[in-house]
């Protein structure tokens, strides 16, 4: 796949998953590291998320579990929590996934992830009311 096609595929995938949230990250990177924004579109979204072996819901579940377990990626976790809602995960599913992380990543890590989810759920609720 050509770089242009990778970028176009990645951008379309990002918009499908995350709408404006991911695009804002890329735009912010234009000021400091435009190439990194390009890589962020091409590799994860153009190459990996666009693969046929797993649907977007499954990919986002894996992503929020990994980001929660890392324990140091709160902004990215919040973006992917929103994306998880966008691709069909319920709040209950998300909560259960994050609670599961207590077993493997510890209670503080799971607690922090649950607090991030609470913020995302509240923001999503406010946006729904505004429509």
Labelled PLM ranges:
Residues 73-95, 109-120:
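Extended intrinsically disordered, low-complexity coil regions enriched in Ser, Thr, Gly, Ala
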Residues 1-57, 111-131:
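Acidic, glycine/proline-rich low-complexity segments that act as flexible tails and inter-domain linkers
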Residues 58-67, 97-98:
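Short, structured motif recognition centered on aromatic/hydrophobic residues
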Residues 83, 99-102:
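Hydrophobic alpha-helical segments of small multi-pass membrane proteins
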Residues 13, 44, 79-80, 96-97:
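A general alpha-helix detector
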Residues 102-108:
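C-terminal structural segments of small proteins and small subunits
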Residues 32-44, 72, 76-79, 85-86:
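Acidic-glycine-rich active-site phosphate/pyrophosphate-binding loop
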Residues 66-73, 106:
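Short alpha-helix boundary/capping elements
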């Amino acid at each position: 796949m050509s770089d242009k096609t990778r970028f176009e595929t990645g951008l379309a995938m990002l918009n499908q998953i995350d709408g404006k949230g991911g695009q804002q990250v890329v735009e912010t990177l234009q000021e400091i590291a435009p190439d990194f924004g390009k890589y962020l579109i091409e590799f994860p979204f153009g190459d990996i998320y666009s693969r046929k072996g797993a649907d977007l819901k499954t990919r986002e579940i894996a992503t929020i579990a990994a980001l929660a377990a890392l324990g140091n990626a709160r902004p990215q976790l919040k973006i992917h929590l929103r994306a998880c809602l966008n691709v069909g995960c319920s709040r209950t599913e998300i909560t259960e996934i994050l609670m599961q992380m207590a077993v493997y990543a510890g209670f503080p890590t799971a607690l922090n992830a649950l607090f991030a989810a609470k913020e995302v759920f509240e923001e999503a609720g406010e946006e729904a009311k505004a429509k």
